[in-house]
Amino acid sequence: MEKKDMLYEGKAKKIFRTDDKDTVVVYYKDDATAFNGEKKGTIEDKGVMNNSITAMLFELLEKKGVKTHFIEKINEREQLCKKVEIVPLEVIVRNIAAGSMAKRLGLSEGRKLDTTVFEISYKNDDLNDPLINDYHAVAIGLTTFEELKEMYSIAEKVNNTLKEFFDEQGINLVDFKIEIGRFNGELLLADEISPDTCRLWDKSTGEKLDKDRFRRDMGNVKEAYMEILKRVNK
């Protein structure tokens, strides 16, 4: 496998072509952003930690029957992945009220929800990734009802697997977001699963071990990511 020119650079990762049209190299950066890029910073070694955390969690999910774009970890910052066409939606899964949902609905942060909540947002930076419903997504040509049904099924499997896994590590999986990609007629879990994309709270202390520490200027951001890596790597 030979790494070639850069295809795309996002907020947290760079994507490179390879000599195989069906694969890409994903490079994890140390850049941190919040509030749709309004807040910017750097977290030392974030890319190294998120690459490792994502690789381990994707391997776990593959073993549990969730198909992903992940092929292998190449080095401390890069992984080889299938070249998917990303569906321009984020699926957000919420087990405990926090963040924008708590604010939007006037709920106290930390309230356990009576059922898991599934939301979708339209991946569009210019519009600040607005929440939409299934009908919007289909009406504006982003996806189909059949594809959405499968996306929610993938999200539910990911939630069930990771909730149980993190619980064993003494962590509450509060909420998370995933992206899905199309590859040879299949839908695959793509992007990453890390403290950048999940809210992870210590079960005994309630301490936040995720990007909220950066968003809210709580300090000890690197230490929180290191703690998640340590627990995932047990």
UniProtKB/Swiss-Prot annotation:
UniProt GO BP: 'de novo' IMP biosynthetic process; cobalamin biosynthetic process
Entries under InterPro entries matching the protein: SAICAR_synt/ADE2_N, SAICAR_synt_PurC, SAICAR_synth, SAICAR_synthetase, SAICAR_synthetase_CS
Keywords from the UniProt entry: ATP-binding, Ligase, Nucleotide-binding, Purine biosynthesis
Enzyme Commission no: 6.3.2.6
Pathway terms, separated by semicolons: Purine metabolism; IMP biosynthesis via de novo pathway; 5-amino-1-(5-phospho-D-ribosyl)imidazole-4-carboxamide from 5-amino-1-(5-phospho-D-ribosyl)imidazole-4-carboxylate: step 1/2
Domain of life: Bacteria
The keyword Ligase is annotated on this UniProt entry: yes
NCBIfam families tied to this protein: purC (TIGR00081)
PANTHER family recorded: MULTIFUNCTIONAL PROTEIN ADE2, SI:DKEY-6E2.2
Protein name per its UniProtKB record: Phosphoribosylaminoimidazole-succinocarboxamide synthase
Source organism (scientific name): Clostridium botulinum (strain Hall / ATCC 3502 / NCTC 13319 / Type A)
